[in-house]
Amino acid sequence: MNRDTRLYLAWLVALAATLGSLYFSEIRHFNPCPLCWAQRIFMYPLAVILGIAAFVGDHGVRRYVLPLAALGLGFAIFQNLETWGFVQSIKACTVNAAAACNTPWPVWGTSQDTLNRALTIPVLSMIAFALILALLSWPRQRVTVPESAAVQG
Protein backbone atom coordinates (compact mmCIF):
# COMPACT_ATOMS: atom_id res chain seq x y z
CA MET A 1 0.00 0.00 0.00
CA ASN A 2 1.55 3.30 -1.01
CA ARG A 3 1.58 6.53 0.97
CA ASP A 4 -1.13 8.19 -1.12
CA THR A 5 -3.51 5.29 -0.49
CA ARG A 6 -2.82 5.37 3.25
CA LEU A 7 -3.43 9.12 3.34
CA TYR A 8 -6.77 8.75 1.55
CA LEU A 9 -7.78 5.86 3.83
CA ALA A 10 -6.89 7.88 6.93
CA TRP A 11 -9.03 10.73 5.59
CA LEU A 12 -11.96 8.36 4.94
CA VAL A 13 -11.70 7.01 8.49
CA ALA A 14 -11.69 10.54 9.95
CA LEU A 15 -14.58 11.58 7.69
CA ALA A 16 -16.65 8.52 8.63
CA ALA A 17 -15.95 9.11 12.33
CA THR A 18 -16.94 12.77 12.06
CA LEU A 19 -20.14 12.06 10.14
CA GLY A 20 -20.98 9.19 12.51
CA SER A 21 -20.47 11.45 15.51
CA LEU A 22 -22.78 14.07 14.02
CA TYR A 23 -25.36 11.38 13.18
CA PHE A 24 -25.46 10.09 16.75
CA SER A 25 -25.81 13.55 18.29
CA GLU A 26 -28.00 15.32 15.72
CA ILE A 27 -30.18 12.50 14.34
CA ARG A 28 -30.33 9.99 17.21
CA HIS A 29 -30.14 12.76 19.85
CA PHE A 30 -27.41 11.20 22.00
CA ASN A 31 -25.94 13.77 24.40
CA PRO A 32 -22.14 13.82 24.04
CA CYS A 33 -20.31 13.54 27.36
CA PRO A 34 -17.20 15.63 28.18
CA LEU A 35 -14.88 12.84 27.02
CA CYS A 36 -16.85 12.54 23.77
CA TRP A 37 -16.43 16.28 23.24
CA ALA A 38 -12.68 15.94 23.77
CA GLN A 39 -12.53 13.19 21.15
CA ARG A 40 -14.57 15.34 18.75
CA ILE A 41 -12.11 18.21 19.28
CA PHE A 42 -9.33 15.94 18.00
CA MET A 43 -11.29 14.07 15.28
CA TYR A 44 -13.16 16.86 13.49
CA PRO A 45 -10.02 18.77 12.41
CA LEU A 46 -8.52 15.49 11.17
CA ALA A 47 -11.34 15.13 8.64
CA VAL A 48 -10.56 18.55 7.18
CA ILE A 49 -6.75 18.46 7.42
CA LEU A 50 -6.42 14.91 6.06
CA GLY A 51 -8.89 15.67 3.27
CA ILE A 52 -6.88 18.64 2.07
CA ALA A 53 -3.60 16.75 2.45
CA ALA A 54 -4.94 13.75 0.52
CA PHE A 55 -6.11 15.88 -2.40
CA VAL A 56 -2.88 17.87 -2.70
CA GLY A 57 -0.60 14.92 -1.86
CA ASP A 58 0.98 16.55 1.21
CA HIS A 59 2.70 13.73 3.08
CA GLY A 60 4.29 16.19 5.51
CA VAL A 61 0.89 16.50 7.18
CA ARG A 62 1.80 13.53 9.37
CA ARG A 63 3.69 15.78 11.77
CA TYR A 64 0.45 17.70 12.42
CA VAL A 65 -2.12 14.93 12.50
CA LEU A 66 -0.25 12.24 14.44
CA PRO A 67 -0.30 14.28 17.69
CA LEU A 68 -4.03 15.02 17.23
CA ALA A 69 -4.79 11.35 16.62
CA ALA A 70 -2.61 10.25 19.56
CA LEU A 71 -4.33 12.65 21.97
CA GLY A 72 -7.75 11.59 20.70
CA LEU A 73 -6.78 7.94 21.16
CA GLY A 74 -5.73 8.69 24.73
CA PHE A 75 -9.14 10.16 25.54
CA ALA A 76 -10.88 7.24 23.79
CA ILE A 77 -8.86 4.66 25.73
CA PHE A 78 -9.60 6.42 29.01
CA GLN A 79 -13.33 6.56 28.24
CA ASN A 80 -13.40 2.87 27.38
CA LEU A 81 -11.52 1.97 30.55
CA GLU A 82 -14.08 4.02 32.47
CA THR A 83 -17.01 2.34 30.69
CA TRP A 84 -15.54 -1.11 31.33
CA GLY A 85 -15.07 -0.27 35.02
CA PHE A 86 -11.25 -0.30 35.11
CA VAL A 87 -10.91 3.34 36.17
CA GLN A 88 -13.11 5.56 38.29
CA SER A 89 -15.29 8.19 36.58
CA ILE A 90 -13.78 11.66 36.56
CA LYS A 91 -15.79 14.44 38.19
CA ALA A 92 -16.68 16.12 34.87
CA CYS A 93 -18.32 12.88 33.77
CA THR A 94 -20.63 12.61 36.77
CA VAL A 95 -22.13 16.11 36.72
CA ASN A 96 -24.75 15.52 34.01
CA ALA A 97 -26.50 12.15 34.16
CA ALA A 98 -27.93 12.70 30.66
CA ALA A 99 -24.39 12.71 29.27
CA ALA A 100 -22.49 10.37 31.58
CA CYS A 101 -19.13 9.21 30.21
CA ASN A 102 -19.64 5.60 31.24
CA THR A 103 -22.95 5.19 29.38
CA PRO A 104 -22.59 2.36 26.84
CA TRP A 105 -24.30 4.16 23.94
CA PRO A 106 -25.61 1.60 21.44
CA VAL A 107 -24.49 1.80 17.85
CA TRP A 108 -27.75 0.23 16.65
CA GLY A 109 -30.78 -1.26 18.35
CA THR A 110 -30.81 -1.08 22.13
CA SER A 111 -28.02 -1.19 24.68
CA GLN A 112 -29.18 -4.69 25.67
CA ASP A 113 -28.27 -6.23 22.29
CA THR A 114 -25.22 -8.48 22.63
CA LEU A 115 -23.10 -6.69 20.02
CA ASN A 116 -23.93 -3.26 21.44
CA ARG A 117 -22.41 -4.18 24.77
CA ALA A 118 -19.06 -4.70 23.03
CA LEU A 119 -19.22 -2.31 20.08
CA THR A 120 -20.10 1.06 21.59
CA ILE A 121 -19.50 4.57 20.28
CA PRO A 122 -16.34 5.01 22.44
CA VAL A 123 -15.00 1.72 21.04
CA LEU A 124 -15.64 2.97 17.49
CA SER A 125 -13.80 6.20 18.34
CA MET A 126 -10.85 4.25 19.72
CA ILE A 127 -10.74 2.08 16.58
CA ALA A 128 -10.88 5.16 14.31
CA PHE A 129 -8.02 6.95 16.09
CA ALA A 130 -5.94 3.75 16.15
CA LEU A 131 -6.55 3.18 12.42
CA ILE A 132 -5.51 6.73 11.57
CA LEU A 133 -2.34 6.35 13.65
CA ALA A 134 -1.55 2.98 12.07
CA LEU A 135 -2.14 4.19 8.51
CA LEU A 136 0.01 7.29 8.94
CA SER A 137 2.76 5.58 10.99
CA TRP A 138 3.27 2.78 8.50
CA PRO A 139 6.96 2.85 7.52
CA ARG A 140 7.72 4.09 4.05
CA GLN A 141 9.03 1.46 1.65
CA ARG A 142 12.19 2.52 -0.11
CA VAL A 143 12.69 1.39 -3.67
CA THR A 144 16.20 0.14 -4.23
CA VAL A 145 17.74 0.12 -7.66
CA PRO A 146 20.23 -2.67 -8.39
CA GLU A 147 23.75 -1.40 -9.17
CA SER A 148 23.71 -2.95 -12.64
CA ALA A 149 20.54 -1.02 -13.55
CA ALA A 150 21.95 2.21 -12.11
CA VAL A 151 25.16 1.91 -14.13
CA GLN A 152 23.31 1.25 -17.40
CA GLY A 153 20.77 4.05 -16.87
UniProtKB/Swiss-Prot annotation:
GO molecular function, one term: protein-disulfide reductase activity
InterPro entries reported for this sequence: DiS_bond_form_DsbB/BdbC, Disulphide_bond_form_BdbC, DsbB-like_sf
Keywords: Cell membrane, Chaperone, Disulfide bond, Electron transport, Membrane, Oxidoreductase, Redox-active center, Transmembrane, Transmembrane helix, Transport
Membrane topology value: Multi-pass membrane protein
Compartments (UniProt record): Cell membrane
Cysteine pairings via disulfide bonds: 33-36, 93-101
GO cellular component: plasma membrane
TM region(s), chain numbering: 4-23, 38-57, 64-81, 117-139
GO biological process assignments: protein folding
UniProt function note: Required for disulfide bond formation in some proteins.
Similarity comment text for this entry: Belongs to the DsbB family. BdbC subfamily.
Name this polypeptide is given: Probable disulfide formation protein
